[in-house]
Amino acid sequence: MLNRVVLVGRLTRDPDLRYTPNGVAVANFNIAVNRPFSNQQGNREADFINCVIWRRPAENLANYMKKGSMVGVDGRIQTRNFEGQDGKTVYVTEVVADSVQFLETKGSQGGQDSSGGYQQNRNQNQYQNQNQYASNQNQDQEDPFKNNGEPIDISDDDLPF
């Protein structure tokens, strides 16, 4: 049996970080996930998914992501129930996240944090350095598929089809 969920969406509110009596961090959050089709008016509707994440990833989510941040969630569906304040049973279906990926830098979220520009520049420089390293590596390796103008000698028996 398989219970696996992968979602990409935007936080609908700031994550709600709390701690259990034992000191374990838990964050509740909601994400809006666009549906892959449009309605009759041509608008794309969204589903609003309740999620929960535990321990250090919960603290990271609460510290670095805010309402509107784009995140990727990997986890599983869980249903649970509890007795509400009015004595009625309340049923909850939520995604228990194993991991949350931050899909935007702080600087791309509209300047919510004054250090966002520094972080974005640092990431950009790191990306440029990685690209320069990769291009230098590519120059050192010769293309095995480069055509030197010579016919390719291969028998029909060597072809997989």
Swiss-Prot record:
Residues 115-139 have a biased composition (Low complexity). PROSITE patterns: SSB. Gene3D superfamilies: Nucleic acid-binding proteins (2.40.50.140). The lineage of its organism: Bacteria, Bacillati, Bacillota, Bacilli, Bacillales. InterPro entries: NA-bd_OB-fold, Primosome_PriB/ssb, ssDNA-bd. Residues 1-104 form the SSB domain. Keywords: DNA damage, DNA recombination, DNA repair, DNA replication, DNA-binding. The keyword DNA damage applies. Homotetramer. The keyword DNA-binding applies. Residues 106-161 are annotated as: Disordered. GO terms for biological process: DNA recombination; DNA repair; DNA replication. GO terms for molecular function: single-stranded DNA binding. GO terms for cellular component: nucleoid. A motif (Important for interaction with partner proteins) lies at residues 156-161. It comes from Oceanobacillus iheyensis (strain DSM 14371 / CIP 107618 / JCM 11309 / KCTC 3954 / HTE831). This is Single-stranded DNA-binding protein.
